[in-house]
């Protein structure tokens, strides 16, 4: 079994924020692989699912914590303990400001790199869980980061956002059998990152 958790904030006003791209990824995964409706569980909204792999079906728990971004670990830890899973059975999808828009990287272990949601998960389950990092770009100055991540994606950003969310769902069978490197490569093959940040106008030659 795998827990696929997204980082985000639960209120409707945050729904389209860059900080909620983890929730968006889990929603895409649920549309593709979910087998039951969302319901309140584990201090969040949870949905059961199943993904087909060459090694047979793998059960899924899709999870959107309602604890707010910075306390996401409480929900993830509760679900992991309930199902008696290991941290390596958990993938947490989240926004990554230190990656260009539309990039996707899998990572296992390591520090939180200033991400309070990841720090919260680490405090509950240790640092061996897997992370699906979705690049949203950086506003250019650290004082602008909070306003930036709590801002909605611009219309032009959906040129890369919508395809990468679909790819994260479509390529999941590779992650379900533990091949995170192949999963990452397949997501980027299905949804290549833009060559330039679509938020910024192209410079004249």
From Swiss-Prot:
Keywords: Cytoplasm, Hydrolase, RNA-binding, tRNA-binding
Subcellular location: Cytoplasm
Site (Discriminates between blocked and unblocked aminoacyl-tRNA): 9
Residues annotated to bind tRNA: 14, 68, 70, 116
Active site: 19
Species the sequence originates in: Caulobacter vibrioides (strain NA1000 / CB15N) (Caulobacter crescentus)
GO MF annotations in UniProt: peptidyl-tRNA hydrolase activity; tRNA binding
Keyword Metal-binding annotated: no
UniProt catalytic activity: an N-acyl-L-alpha-aminoacyl-tRNA + H2O = an N-acyl-L-amino acid + a tRNA + H(+)
A Pfam family this chain is assigned to: Pept_tRNA_hydro
Protein name, UniProt field: Peptidyl-tRNA hydrolase
């Amino acid at each position: 079994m795998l827990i696929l958790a997204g980082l985000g904030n639960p209120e409707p006003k945050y729904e389209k924020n860059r900080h909620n791209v983890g929730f968006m990824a889990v929603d895409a995964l649920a549309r593709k692989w979910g087998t039951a409706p969302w319901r309140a569980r584990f201090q969040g909204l949870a949905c059961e699912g199943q993904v087909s792999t060459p090694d047979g079906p793998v059960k899924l728990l899709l999870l959107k914590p309602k604890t707010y971004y910075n306390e996401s670990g409480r929900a993830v830890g509760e679900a992991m303990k309930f199902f008696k899973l290991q941290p390596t059975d958990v993938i947490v999808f989240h926004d990554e400001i230190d990656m260009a828009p539309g990039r996707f990287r899998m990572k296992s272990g390591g520090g939180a790199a200033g991400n309070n949601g990841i720090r919260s998960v680490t405090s509950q389950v240790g640092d061996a869980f897997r992370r699906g990092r979705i690049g949203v770009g950086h506003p250019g100055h650290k004082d602008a980061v909070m306003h930036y991540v709590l801002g909605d994606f611009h219309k032009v950003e959906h040129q890369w956002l919508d395809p990468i969310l679909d790819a994260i769902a479509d390529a999941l069978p590779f992650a379900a059998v533990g091949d995170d490197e192949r999963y990452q490569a397949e997501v980027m093959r299905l949804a290549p990152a833009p060559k330039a940040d679509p938020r910024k106008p192209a410079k004249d030659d």
